[in-house]
């Protein structure tokens, strides 16, 4: 990992704390995983403060596969089955079936409709009947141990919502891409973060932060 690129956003602890404050302020953060893993950066927003403009940015600047990261207990309360029974994906990404809000959407694919779906699913007291399946939002189940159990963007998202002290631990993510459709790597992630006034941190930063807080 190129520390020179990362250090313009502070040291590891500062990057995490800036990211947590950004989430409290309703802003987005960029989180990169290890270069030997997916080697990708995800743009992350909290579900509770997500706006149509932020969703439009996710659709425009990223892969378009907007995911809603939720704790295991939330997935179970919504009775969302996993997408496949036998997950053979390389990194064990825990997709459930895709979802749509049962009310208040049209085709489900617009930024407005996807925000409606995210907020419907993430809401306190949301019920299985509030959602239709399949849809245009892709829920992801976070491991209970967060990034200390799995060094994934899903776990990083839920961990950050909790560490930020947000009422709702759910968050949305999408992988940042370049204009030509290739995946954005660390240099492009740093450029994007600077252009949009965001902080760039890593999953490893977050894991180290949690370990220092909890030990």
UniProtKB/Swiss-Prot annotation:
Family: Belongs to the DHBP synthase family.
InterPro entries in the record: DHBP_synth_RibB-like_a/b_dom, DHBP_synthase_RibB
Cofactor note as given: Binds 2 divalent metal cations per subunit. Magnesium or manganese.
GO molecular function terms attached to this record: 3,4-dihydroxy-2-butanone-4-phosphate synthase activity; magnesium ion binding; manganese ion binding
Lineage: Bacteria, Pseudomonadati, Thermodesulfobacteriota, Desulfobacteria, Desulfobacterales
Gene Ontology biological-process annotations: riboflavin biosynthetic process
Cellular-component GO terms for this entry: cytosol
Keywords linked to the UniProt accession: Lyase, Magnesium, Manganese, Metal-binding, Riboflavin biosynthesis
Positions with a binding annotation for Mg(2+) 1: 38
Positions annotated to bind D-ribulose 5-phosphate: 37-38, 42, 150-154, 175
Enzyme Commission number(s): 4.1.99.12
Gene3D superfamilies membership: DHBP synthase
Binding-site residues, Mg(2+) 2: 38, 153
Pfam families for this protein: DHBP_synthase (PF00926)
Chaperone as UniProt keyword: no
Spans traversing the lipid bilayer: none
The protein, known as: 3,4-dihydroxy-2-butanone 4-phosphate synthase
Entries under HAMAP family matching the protein: RibB
Function: Catalyzes the conversion of D-ribulose 5-phosphate to formate and 3,4-dihydroxy-2-butanone 4-phosphate.
Signal peptide extent: none
Domain of life: Bacteria
UniProt subunit comment: Homodimer.
Organism: Desulfatibacillum aliphaticivorans
Cofactor dependency: Mg(2+); Mn(2+)
UniProt pathway: Cofactor biosynthesis; riboflavin biosynthesis; 2-hydroxy-3-oxobutyl phosphate from D-ribulose 5-phosphate: step 1/1
Record site feature (Essential for catalytic activity), residues: 136, 175
């Amino acid at each position: 990992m190129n520390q020179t690129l990362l250090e313009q956003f502070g040291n590891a602890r500062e990057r995490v704390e800036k990211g947590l404050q950004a989430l409290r302020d309703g802003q987005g953060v960029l989180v990169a995983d290890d270069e030997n893993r997916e080697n990708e950066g995800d743009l992350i927003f909290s579900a509770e403060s997500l706006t149509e403009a932020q969703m439009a940015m996710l659709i425009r600047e990223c892969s378009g596969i907007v995911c809603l990261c939720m704790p295991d207990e939330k997935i179970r309360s919504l009775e969302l089955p996993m997408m496949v029974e036998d997950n053979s994906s390389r990194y064990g990404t825990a997709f459930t079936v895709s979802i749509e809000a049962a009310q208040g959407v049209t085709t489900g694919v617009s930024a407005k409709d996807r925000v409606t779906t995210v907020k419907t699913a993430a809401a306190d007291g949301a019920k299985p009947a509030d959602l239709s399946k399949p849809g245009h939002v892709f829920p992801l189940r976070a491991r209970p141990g967060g990034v200390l159990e799995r060094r994934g963007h899903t776990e990083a998202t839920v961990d950050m919502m909790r560490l930020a002290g947000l009422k709702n631990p759910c968050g949305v993510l999408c992988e940042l891409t370049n204009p030509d459709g290739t995946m954005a790597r660390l240099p492009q992630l740093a450029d994007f973060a600077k252009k949009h006034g965001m902080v760039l941190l890593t999953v490893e930063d977050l894991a180290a932060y949690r370990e220092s807080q909890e030990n």
